[in-house]
Amino acid sequence: MNQLDALKQVTTVVADTGDFRQLGAYRPQDATTNPSLILKAVQKADYAPLLQESVERWRGRALDEIMDRLIVRFGCEILSLIPGRVSTEVDARLSFDTMATVTRGERIIDLYRAEGVDTARVLIKIAATWEGIEAARILEERGIHTNLTLLFSPVQAVACGAARVQLISPFVGRIYDWYKKQAGAQWDEAAMAGANDPGVQSVRQIYQYYKHFGIRTEVMGASFRNIGQITALAGCDLLTIAPELLAQLAASEAPLERALDPASAKDLELQPVQYDEPGFRYALNADAMATEKLAEGIRAFAADAAKLEQMVLAA
């Protein structure tokens, strides 16, 4: 059995791509997208007709509405190829505006509904800022499920659990990148691999906290740099994986053992944590890595959204 099939026995495998033509080869349950992945897809010749058709169909509408209709179009194409859910992201430029995020999330859901999609199959993806988490709380109360992304810290995870969001996406690779850069020449790749990887350790800590306290929010590890990070999190609720790494897993016959188990978390000695807004902001600020990576991620997604807008305007 290859590692991809073995992983599917203990974890829900999710494809992290806007290039939906790659989905058939790996048969993921769910899929995730973000502005960067959609931009990458529409830059390919295969997707030029989809972009052009979407722009022509909705020409004359506000630019932000055309953008939402375009990403929903990608989501609908993805949903036609998978049995599960797709995550569609709210504009990252709204990451510090709770009610604007709520409004945009509701519009995205309405657009899916207008296309005949069962909206239980859609997760609204939101950056895990304080404002984003509060927006997710409101959306969940209104029956709209959410995926909180750009999550780099247990502080964010605790707040998301308290907000009863459907799913969180703690990042692995970007945490790894930060610690590797900080260490410079002192970084020992072999010593920091697998279970010792700081990104893997972060997801494991969050997973154990949730399972220990019976928090129902799903944990989906994200942002991987190598398959060692993925196999070290086998057993996590979900893992969202880029097609290149899915291909590597499918090509590997190495044994794969379950690394995370909810039952083992019950025996840990953990203390519950709660954050109000000032406490959240202070605790997140105290984590230099999480603060830097959250800000960097929002800037990158916002920049790619702006590039995608320029492609829409030029179409």
Swiss-Prot record:
Gene Ontology, cellular component aspect: cytoplasm
SUPFAM superfamilies reported in the protein's UniProt record: Aldolase
Cross-referenced CDD domains: Transaldolase_TalAB
Catalytic activity, reaction form: D-sedoheptulose 7-phosphate + D-glyceraldehyde 3-phosphate = D-erythrose 4-phosphate + beta-D-fructose 6-phosphate
Pathway assigned to this chain's UniProt record: Carbohydrate degradation; pentose phosphate pathway; D-glyceraldehyde 3-phosphate and beta-D-fructose 6-phosphate from D-ribose 5-phosphate and D-xylulose 5-phosphate (non-oxidative stage): step 2/3
Enzyme Commission code: 2.2.1.2
InterPro entries in the record: Aldolase_TIM, TAL/FSA, Transaldolase_1, Transaldolase_AS
GO molecular function: transaldolase activity
Region forming the signal peptide: none
Subcellular location as annotated: Cytoplasm
Keyword annotations from UniProtKB, A to Z: Cytoplasm, Pentose shunt, Schiff base, Transferase
Predominant place of localization: cytoplasm
Biological-process GO terms, alphabetical: carbohydrate metabolic process; pentose-phosphate shunt
Active site feature: K125
Entry similarity comment: Belongs to the transaldolase family. Type 1 subfamily.
Task performed by this protein: Transaldolase is important for the balance of metabolites in the pentose-phosphate pathway.
PANTHER family with a match to the protein in the record: TRANSALDOLASE
Subunit structure: Homodimer.
Descriptive protein name: Transaldolase
Native species: Paracidovorax citrulli (strain AAC00-1)
Gene name of this polypeptide: tal
